[in-house]
Regions:
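Generic hydrophobic alpha-helical membrane-segment signal
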Residues: 23, 52-58
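A short, structure-level motif marking secondary-structure boundaries and short turns
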Residues: 18, 41-42
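Transmembrane alpha-helical segments and their short flanking loops
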Residues: 1-16, 29-34, 38, 55-56, ...
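Structural signature of hydrophobic alpha-helical transmembrane segments
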Residues: 18-26
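Membrane-proximal intracellular helices of multi-pass ion channels
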Residues: 36, 42-52
């Protein structure tokens, strides 16, 4: 379908029901990293943790690899991981309702979004809905995860006590 000039709109059930991953990789996971960063009290830990959180957010955004973020949530609090899973599921529903049909090969990051969405044209993929819905999804997930991290007192990166941090480093 990608090479066929007669294709006016992609209708692959795989692409239709798999395009929600783009919301998650491009918007939800960077929002989660920002929430983790902003939940760290101001001080040296916040500055020291910035590089880690920025790099895993950037990795999720560009390549779609989200395991470092997911594991940080899972180990900090399983409830944060459940919230991520629910957010992920909602992303699929929104993408299917908007009839977004962006294919992917591996991960649904920015590279694949451009190759299989933007470069194929909005008429074929409805890629614009990823951006239109992605911004409110980013905002909602940022506030949701910041609230959950603070209410659960989750020990996300940078929020652990000095004793816990030293113990981790000594092992």
């Amino acid at each position: 379908q990608l090479a066929d000039p007669n294709t006016t709109h992609y209708f692959s059930n795989i692409a239709l029901y798999n395009s929600g991953r783009y919301f998650h990789m491009l918007f939800t996971m960077p929002a989660v990293c920002l929430a983790m960063y902003r939940a760290i009290p101001a001080g040296p830990k916040r500055k020291a943790t910035f590089g880690f959180l920025f790099s895993i957010a950037l990795t999720a955004f560009i390549t779609g690899v989200t395991e470092p973020i997911s594991f940080a949530l899972l180990f900090a609090s399983p409830l944060l991981f459940v919230a991520e899973a629910i957010s992920f599921a909602i992303s699929f529903v929104i993408a299917a309702m908007a009839k977004v049909t962006i294919g992917s090969t591996f991960s649904a990051g920015l590279v694949e979004f451009l190759l299989f969405g933007v470069f194929q044209g909005n008429a074929k993929t409805n890629w614009i809905w990823i951006v239109i819905w992605g911004i409110p999804i980013f905002i909602a997930n940022y506030f949701l995860f910041k609230l959950l991290i603070e209410k659960l007192n989750a020990k996300t990166p940078g929020r652990e006590s000095d004793e816990e941090a030293e113990k981790k480093l000594s092992n």
